[in-house]
Amino acid sequence: MSSLFRVGGDAYDDFMGRYSTRLAGPFADFAGVEPGQRALDVGAGTGALTAELVARGVSVAAADPSPEFATVLRERFPNLEVEEAPAESLPWGDGVFDVALAQLVVAFVSDAPAAVAEMARVARRVAVCMWGIAEVDMFAAIDRTDSVIGTSRTEPRRYRTPQEIHDLLAPLGEVESAELDVTAGYRDYDEFWQALQRGVGPAGHWIASLDAEALERAHQELFRQLGSPSGPFELRARAFAGAVMPG
């Protein structure tokens, strides 16, 4: 996970933050987060979900394996307990949280079943969500561009469907499921392209791997795949969520 996200907080926010901040509210609603609870944000990144939980009057702790993101979290939330730790090895005792949440995380951990089992160990309720690939306009357009220009983009594809999320959590108990839809806006295509070039995640690594000729072809084809926007535009994204009360 960390090798795809060894970037600064500003770069991550520029690329994905415009989506993750909008997702945090619906995800917290789905997870049943209530004021006064104690919650753990697993794979907290730069703190989009953390900020939402704090705003709801929740006592929050956060974990992320990336040293860069852990530093950002401590700077942005100096009063919170932040641990540099992977989802598969959380440094808290059994049952100390009311809820453990992982937003946009499980596709990128080395052992997702171990991660959700560890979340179930430390919390009485577990909730996870991941973007679908085809259901996110940006990723779908990038995939089509990759196919047209003949490059070799890679993206973790597991846990990107409702069934995969259900099956991941099913060993822990009865699973509740939901689809969470958000939109993100851009001033213009240049803003979108610049965010993509920040090197964040699989999409950013794909862009960084292209030579000058392929990069220019990607720039032109992706513009076409997004509908050749001439000004402000929005892109849709859908996350598949699951929650369980381990029993």
PLM-predicted stretches and their roles:
Residues 104-107:
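Short catalytic micro-motifs in class I SAM-dependent methyltransferases
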Residues 1-9:
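N-terminal, positively charged/glycine-rich alpha-helical extensions of SAM-dependent methyltransferases
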Residues 113-125:
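A short glycine-rich, Lys/Arg-flanked "PGG" loop and its adjoining helix->strand segment in the class I
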Residues 125-151:
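Conserved class I S-adenosyl-L-methionine
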Residues 101:
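A conserved beta-strand element that flanks and buttresses the S-adenosyl-L-methionine
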Residues 38-90:
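Class I SAM-dependent methyltransferase SAM/SAH-binding core
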Residues 4-5, 19, 46-48, 158-247:
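Conserved Class I S-adenosyl-L-methionine
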Residues 18-35:
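Conserved alpha-helix/loop element of class I SAM-dependent methyltransferases that forms part
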